[in-house]
Design a protein with these regions (language model features):
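Short, intrinsically disordered low-complexity segments enriched in Ser/Thr with adjacent Pro
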Residues: 7-17
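Histidine- and acidic-residue-rich, metal-dependent catalytic cores
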Residues: 20-36, 43-233
Length: 233
């Protein structure tokens, strides 16, 4: 095993509570994300709830992407990379769920922001940065998803500490989140967004190399690049 801790890391990853929508007018998202009442979903209802939130994640994925396959590809690559890095079977299931649900919080971001072709304003960018927190709040009632929550919360943290929402760095970032970060970036670049033309696999690979050790964990990046080379061959 290349690491001595689980893919989700410490529960302290969640940090303090967040005032998500301070000084904004998007109260509907606040109501949906904050007022969800059940502390937990009954065990018998968990699978149905998970199916619903996966459908919600697919809906969010359809905005601003060229083909809506981003989360499916992210989950598949996360499984493959997890296996290569020696993760347990249980952790690979968690990575797959995190890959499918990492952007579910975007379902509560205004469509005008998700589909905006130009750069976001400072306020819009602040709102966009809350999607990992919103996602965790929606998923938290499902006990079965608990191992995936720190990964989903931290998948936009950067290895150098410049990411969001908690400015974690290095091994403070859950190992699973470092995996999702790399594969999420690759599938985003190769699928394209409304604000970014899709890249070739070669172009996206070069971008991963450029950002290795800064945005991404270098060890995880190297392992993923090996997977891409194996696919090419």
């Amino acid at each position: 095993m290349p690491h001595n801790h689980g893919i989700a890391g410490s529960s302290s990853t969640f940090g303090k509570d967040h005032d998500l929508w301070h000084d904004t007018t998007f109260s509907l998202s606040e109501i949906i994300a904050y007022s969800y009442s059940p502390a937990t979903v009954p065990v018998y209802a968990e699978d149905g709830y998970i199916s619903t939130v996966i459908a919600l994640a697919r809906h969010a994925d359809s905005f601003g992407t060229s083909n809506g396959n981003h989360i499916t590809q992210t989950a598949a690559y996360a499984r493959t990379l997890g296996k290569k890095l020696g993760c347990s079977a249980e952790d690979i299931v968690t990575l797959s769920l995190a890959g499918l649900l990492h952007d579910v919080g975007k379902a509560f971001i205004p469509e005008a922001i998700l589909t905006k072709p130009g750069g976001l304003s400072a306020t819009e960018w602040m709102i966009m940065q809350q999607h990992p927190v919103l996602g965790v709040r929606i998923l938290r009632p499902v006990v079965k998803l608990s191992p995936a929550l720190p990964i989903i919360l931290s998948h936009h943290e950067h290895y150098d500490g410049s990411g969001y929402p908690n400015k974690l760095s290095g091994e403070e970032i859950p190992f699973g989140a470092r995996i999702i970060s790399v594969v999420d970036a690759f599938t985003t670049m190769t699928n394209g967004r409304v604000y970014q033309k899709e890249m070739t696999r070669e172009e996206a690979s070069l971008e991963l190399v450029r950002c290795s050790g800064k945005q991404f964990d270098g060890f995880v990046t190297e392992a993923f690049l090996e997977i891409l080379k194996e696919e090419k061959n």
